[in-house]
Amino acid sequence: MTRKKADSANKKPTPKKATPPVAEKAAPATVKKEAAPKKAAPVEEKAAPAAAKKEAAPKKAAPVEEKASPATAKKEATPKKAAPVEEKAVPAAEAPAPVEVMAHQPRRSVAFIGSECYPFVKTGGLGDVMYALPRELVRLNCDVRVILPRYACIPKEYQDKMVYRGEFYMDLGRTGRNYYVGIMEYIHDGVVYDFIDNQEFFSTGNPYINLVDDIPKYCFFSKAALAALNYMNWIPDIVHCHDWQAALVPVFLKTLFQSSPVGKAKSILTIHNLRFQGIYNIPTIQYWTGLPDSVFVMGALKQGYEDANMLKGGLAYADRITTVSGTYAQEIQTKEYGEGLENHLWYHSQKLRGIVNGIDYGMWNPETDPSLVENYSLGNVLDHKMANKLALQKELGLEEDEGKFVIGLISRLTNQKGLDLVSAVIPQVMDGNTQVVILGTGDREFEDTFRYYEGAYKGQFAACIQYDESRAHRIYAGADALLVPSRFEPCGLTQLNAMHYGTLPIVRETGGLKDTVEPYNDFTGDGNGFTFDRYESGLLLDAINRAKTLYFTNRYHWDEVVQRDMDKDVSWENSAKQYKELYLELTQW
């Protein structure tokens, strides 16, 4: 599209739709739904030597005794209430907001189980997915519930809107106790959010503390989530769980809950970041789960000689495994990216697939974004994006010059995000025609380095050592390019946000970055960003220089790439359709 055509456009165009590792020796076979196997555990792989010494059962977390008699595993699957609850006395839940539903789509019911969800509690990308994907699935005629812990840190404005739905007691592992499980409900945009309440486990401020506290917490949560579905008599077709905190759900489904109503559901486990796996000693996890010895084998939960790996167990028992990009799905089957599970994932590769995340256009949209000084769309980006650039320069104390090339970086300041490469190339990047804006917090080493550069390049370098959501929006709108030079990146959302705001991404070819950014070709003009492959500072500098060369020597082609990026559909719609297809594939009838 030429500049002239772009300027005359009044409406945003309709978006376009757009040597394997050695196998483990006896990994589990998939359990068939119709079968009722006596032993739900996977076939044991070649056993590793037994633990040298047996650990003592861990101490309880000073619980307050609930009055209830011990329950068997079968009873807890359909738990009894501690006292009869009058259904008529339960207040009506908040009426769901009108949602456009594609009624022609086959209907499926899905329970999302995870440890965080925006806007209730969010520490990373998982919270965004748990919020945006269910909302999009509702449009595709899915009946969706999201099950979360009721953390004390959830803002009062949401706590006050929750409606009591009932309570029961549930035995837990080998603790010899029955634990209170309350259910509080909140409905928003057609999605039902059910919060599992137990102050003994969820009273601390931060959802993630340390493994000593988190292992019991998420053993309880995973079991309570399934027991709550039985209690509410809401049996989903699919249980879709996320990361290690909910990875025991597929294990519970095919063992302790197999003969209960919820045991009929199919399970999907999504890996958002393989680095975090929930690894602890076997006696502790046996103590808190009560799972049979048959699951603590090398093909399932057992790892090494003495440890259990909650994520590994979930991968073995889940009917399907997904991760957040196709390239990452391949990478995690290699030693470089597999975090010790590459053989296990290769063995289960027939049930593994990658589905790229999307972004929520309701939150990330330059046409309606209230944080911007001037809103803009595909049709007028060439006129109005510059105003946001000048406003960003003024806000951050940079030299106000529309001719400068502004590079943004919005990230956790850690090695995983490639900040060591960025630190190394800054002196070569700062050539008098370039400005750099950093937003984020993280390792002290990088925070101090970027503060130093801010002092060394006054008026040209801004180090915002904080996370400010509103400022992030303004950087996406005001920068010309965005750096995402990650060492590894399962999916990445910042490059998608940048493209939607007409800011060209400069990324390393890994994970979701490789799947979403096509390198610009100087000869054909194809591509939507600038990339480099090997993790080397010189290659990052080369990618930055290629972007600067196009910007300063061929603005016509630069503007075409800006418009191409804004026209690219990076919404959740495509991702949700792929998940819906997966649900239908698992539940054919």
Placement of each model-derived feature along the sequence:
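Catalytic cores of nucleotide-sugar-dependent glycosyltransferases that transfer UDP/GDP/TDP-activated
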Residues: 2-6, 11-12, 16-17, 81, ...
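Low-complexity, polybasic segments enriched for Lys interleaved with small residues
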Residues: 2, 8-9, 13-31, 35-43, ...
